[in-house]
Design a protein with these regions (language model features):
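ATP-binding Walker
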Residues: 11-14
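Small-molecule kinase domains that catalyze NTP-dependent phosphoryl transfer to phosphate-bearing small molecules
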Residues: 70, 115-122, 129-134, 138, ...
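Walker A/P-loop
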Residues: 17
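Hydrophobic anchor at the beta1->P-loop junction of P-loop NTPases
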Residues: 6-8
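Glycine-rich phosphate-binding loops of nucleotide-dependent enzymes
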Residues: 142-145, 149-151, 156-160, 191, ...
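N-terminal phosphate/diphosphate-binding loop that engages ATP/GTP or pyrophosphate donors
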Residues: 26-90
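ATP-dependent NMP and nucleoside kinases share a basic, alpha-helical "lid"
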Residues: 86-98, 102-162
Length: 223
């Protein structure tokens, strides 16, 4: 059986996670949140007081790490050493350090094999920053989501508020997003690359973006 793979890339706060989850739910696909995997690795490093990119220490931590991704009723769970950390990784501190550790060749190699294997056993939609260019270069559908820095910062602040985190400064979040954009676009390993099927979500509702993506996937399914 031929499974359909959908790669969705985009910068921080572009709506990737929210939108791809909705698309996956409507189509019955598995939603693979690669960002959660990098966050989980980062969460583990921070819990072990690793806050700098030291490749030797990174490799040492990874060598003893038990990492697993499971799907239950189409929902993804990320486990570190047997513990479900899916909710614990959604903090401002983890967000701040995730882009740093994503630069690590060891971290990327550790996760990419896992991500590719997930695409072999089901219809999947996967989001991240280098899915179309590196992880799934032969994906059936490739999409790039973006939005203005101001809109992405606004969305990120709302996300924190929904989690009960109310002491978040909008201007600080905006500057962090700008810095992360620069890091993602200029890193030596797998920089963020805009593919042809780009959708600017700044002025679109979530439902409008979801429908645009579903149209692209349905077209591919019917070929």
């Amino acid at each position: 059986m031929k499974y359909i793979s959908v790669a969705v890339d985009g910068p921080a706060g572009s709506g990737k996670s929210t939108i791809t989850k909705m698309v996956a739910e409507k189509l019955g696909y598995n939603y693979v949140d690669t960002g959660a995997m990098y966050r989980a690795i980062t969460y583990n490093f921070l819990n072990n007081d690793l806050k700098e990119l030291n490749e030797e220490k990174v490799i040492k931590f990874l060598s003893t790490l038990k990492f697993d991704v499971k799907f239950i009723d189409k929902k993804q769970y990320v486990l570190i050493n047997g513990e479900d950390v899916s909710e614990k990784i959604r903090t401002a501190e983890v967000s701040k350090f995730t882009s740093l550790f994503a630069k690590s060749p060891a971290v990327r190699e550790f996760l990419i094999d896992t991500q590719r294997n997930l695409a072999k056993s089901n219809n999947i939609i996967m989001d991240g920053r280098d899915i179309a260019s590196v992880v799934l270069p032969n994906a059936d559908v490739k999409i790039f989501l973006t939005a203005s820095v101001e809109e992405r910062a606004r969305r990120r602040v709302l996300d924190f508020e929904r989690q009960g985190i109310t002491d978040v400064n909008y201007e600080k979040v905006k500057e962090e997003i700008k810095a992360r954009d620069y890091q993602d676009e200029n890193r030596d390993i797998a920089p963020l690359i805009k593919v042809d099927s780009a959708i600017d979500t700044t002025e679109l509702t979530i439902d409008q973006v979801v429908e645009k993506i579903i149209e692209l996937i349905k077209f591919k399914e019917n070929l």
